[in-house]
Structures are given as C-alpha cells and as structure tokens.
Amino acid sequence: MSRRPARCLRALLLAAALASGLTAAQAALPAGALVYGPPVAPPPAERWASDPGDGVYYQVFVRSFQDTDGDGIGDLRGLTARLPYLAGLGITGLWLTPIHPSPSYHGYDVTDYRAIHPELGTMADFLAFLDAAHGHGLRVVLDLVVNHSSDRHPWFVAARAGDPRFRDWYRFASDPEPLIGTLGGSAWHDAGDGTRYLGLFVAEMPDLDHRNPEVVQAMLDVAAFWLDLGVDGFRIDAIQHVVEGEDGAIANAPANLAWVAEFGARLRERHPGAFLVGETWTSTPTIAAYHRDAGLDMSFDYPLWRVLTSAVQARSAIDLRAQLELNEDAYPEGARRGTFVGNHDQPRAATAVSLLRVDPTRVVLLGRLLLALPGTPFVYYGDELAMPNGPGDDDRQKRTPMRWTATEGGGFSAGQPWFPPSTTDPAISVEAQAGDPASVLEAYRSAIALRAAYPALARGNAVVVRDLPASVLAVWRTLAGEAPVLVLANLSNRDLEVAPAQLAAPGVDPGGLVPLDGAPLAGDGSGAWSLPANTLRLLGPAR
C-alpha cells in the first residue's frame, strides 16, 4: 500500500496547524501557568538510531494533563505546551492512552480509529504535537485497542443490524457455550435479535473476531495510518485476549500468540521500525512466551510491578530478589520489558506505599528502584510528584488532573476540571518541587539522569546478591564492555550497616566502589557502610 495519500493528508493537516499558530501552544496555558524545565537542545542524531526500548517513557492520560481552552478537559495543545517539562525531566518517549472518539471518558471503546476525540483537539493539533515531541527527542506510542471496539462503532452498528459483511467481524451466536468474561460475569451479551455477541470486558465493548482475516487487515490498516503520520509505535491493549482458544480459554491461547506474531510481522513489512509493547497482564513464563514465540518487542512486566510495590510496603527484598533472578532465567536474550510502579489501572505509587498520608521518602525509594533495576521504565504522569489516588475505588481517582502549580486547582485548567484533583496539597505540585533537591520531582530527575549516564543501568543484566538481611537489596547491573553498577537499597525503617565483602557476586568485584549518586557513604570505622532507612544508593568502580 502506498504511503503517498497519508503523506499528502499529513502535509495538509500540518499546514492547517501552522496556520492556526499551534507552534505557540504555550500561550494557550491558563493565566499564570508556568512551563517547567530547562531549554532543550535538538536531540542528537544517534537518538533515533538507538533501540526504542532504551530510555524512559512517560504515560499520559491526556484528558487529565493540561487544559488550554478552559473546558476543564486536558487536550493535545496542553500536552504540546508541557513538552519542555517532560524533556527537561529526561523523558525519551511518551505513551498516550486512547485519544480517539469514544463515548467513554477513558477512550478504550473506540468509535473511529482514524480520528482524534474532539474534546482532546483536532488532527492538526495532534500533528503539531507529534512534530514538537520529535523535536524534543521524544518517541510517541499510541494505545491501539484491537481486541474490541465500541458498540457504537459503525462496524458493530452494521453487524448488529445484520449487514453480512460486518456480521462476521464480531462473534454472534444463537446458543453459545457459557463463557466467563474478564470481570467475572457472562462474556455473552444480548444483541436484541435472538442472538448474543461476545464482549469479554463489558457489553459496550464487543470483541472483534480476529479469526477473520478482514478484521486483522482492518487493524493493520489503522496501525499503518498512524505510522504513516509519524507515530513511533503502539501499546497493544488487552493483547492476551485478542484471539480466544478452541478450548474456551480467553487469555494467552496458542492462537493468540500466533496472532501477535503475524500482526507484528505483517506490520513490519510496511513499517520496519514499528515498535509494539503489549499489555501482558499475566505470569512471567507466559510473558516470556510472547517474546520467545511471538517476537513481541516489549512486554509490560506486571509480576515485577507487584513485587516492587510489595517490597517497599513490607520492607523486605526477599520476593524482589527472587523475581529479578526469575526474570534473568525466563526471558530470552534481548527481550525488552516495560517496568512501572503505577498506571491508569493500578493504585498510584504514592497511595500504594503510604499509610494515612503521602510518605515522600518511600515514594522516592520506589521510584529509584524502578529507575535502577532492569527494564524500560514507564513513569505514570504525576507519580514524579507523589500524586496520590483520590478517595474511593472509582478508576477516575487514579486519573485525576495533573498538579502544575501550588494553587488549589493545580494550574490544570482555567475552568472547572472534568474531575476533582486527588489532592490540594500545595507541596504536591511541579511549582513547589521544581529546583528543590529534597523533592520527589528532583529525585526522579536525578535518577533518570543517572540511568542515562551509565549504560549498565539502562541495558545491563541483574546479578542478585543473596546472603544479606531481608531488608537489604543488592543487585549488580552488568553489561559487556561497560563498568558495572551496584544498586544497594535499605528497605527498612532503620539505619543498617553493610560491609563491602558482603556484596560479592559471580563476575563482579566489590572492592574499590565509590558512590555514583552524590554524597559519600558514611562508615563505622571498620570498613562497613551505613545505609540510612528507606535509601537507595548507586556505586561503581572509581573512574
């Protein structure tokens, strides 16, 4: 398929963007709002030749990031205006949750895969954002919802009405075998004509039938459309559910892995540089199979998320050590894993590791673990400020407006925000934390910079030191041709002492280590180091 029509469309839309002055998007921020982050030089040419799995990504729920038109809903112009902040933080890639038209605020039930939700902006806004992001050296990954559409999508409307072409794009049955969906109820829903249709999540999200080659081709065309416009890749939503098994399995069936392999291979025939990361919400051996058997570029490491969070909660490194060793054994060489400590579906990191009120010290510890251990970190917007969940179990409480300023509204919008902020604490804001070396934000900025400075942190293997107290984590990050880095953390709430001799591991020498991250390590006079409570340090050979 020729890319020329898409390129022509892109040129026309970009011209419209420039004519409307979108490159001056910062001027559209609410009065008094500040743009944080130092001036950013153009990215080096080698940035784009590097592995897209390198660097640090940032997940943006666009609706909650920055509003520029006063309607209380974050938009693409707002995201464009905040790119200097993200680049100044050291971020190298962005994952945007769905930005397509949808009847739902979250966007995971799409009605038009080739358009921008009008509440978030226009296609011209998106292209202006995309060019600006690339100008700051940021890759852009979009959410691609392939498993299901909205029940209001024209495809499903036609299918439900009996259109013979689209009827086979979904799964209808007169008397289907019982099947339990992902949320516990029946996966079959009344179509209103004596039949039922499959929707593994909810009735408003009917499953597309990817056993039909026309459906696969339609989604390949959607992906190619966005890649032609300049998008760098996709996060495949619900990747483990796309094709059900013949035995009724709704997740990780052999046919599903075959679909992942085929979809990736066919997409790269048209776009060799396309980058795919999967929402692999499953066990480590099963995730490894998506790499080994299906060639997935990157998975999300849900098992590591669980043990990272629980390690800080329980002040114990035992399960985290075991998971790191399991990962070293389970994944094939070169498998990229997206790591995270929060996202739009999980409790925010600050809420997960705090008790009655946000505990910045433990939030920093969790963030530094994320940024020092193997994988490609994905930072959920606001986690770098210790933004907590709002009250209650509503998923919207994990997706509240970003706090830019120390004001009650946080500088998100000049109007009434679409959802209340999770906190009005002035200390939890970019304005309050930027430049404060004791803040969570500056701890994240420093940890991201250290990761970029030491290749072993970004791409190295993990060699776990075993014979240590339960609350001490010691992991050597090693990479051929590069100096090793020791990640040393005290997860407990009291100071501990560790002797260098305790940190020996196969292939690495604990002698002659110096701190790589600032202040010297205090000792007790006998050669042991004192590790303060809730602290992570990075050490390496003296250069």
Task: List where the protein language model places each region.
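Bacterial N-terminal signal peptides that target proteins for export
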Residues: 2-12
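Bacterial N-terminal signal peptides
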Residues: 11-23
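Acidic/aromatic-lined carbohydrate-recognition and catalytic surfaces
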Residues: 29-220, 224, 228, 239-287, ...
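Loop/helix patches that line or flank the sugar-binding groove of alpha-linked glycan CAZymes
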Residues: 36, 48, 52-53, 264-270, ...
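Hydrophobic residues within beta-strands of alpha/beta enzymes
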Residues: 94, 234-236, 379
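Generic enzyme active-site microenvironment
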Residues: 141-142, 235, 277, 340-341, ...
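Beta-strand-rich binding/interaction modules
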Residues: 495-518
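C-terminal beta-strand-rich structural cap/linker in extracellular carbohydrate-active enzymes
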Residues: 523-543
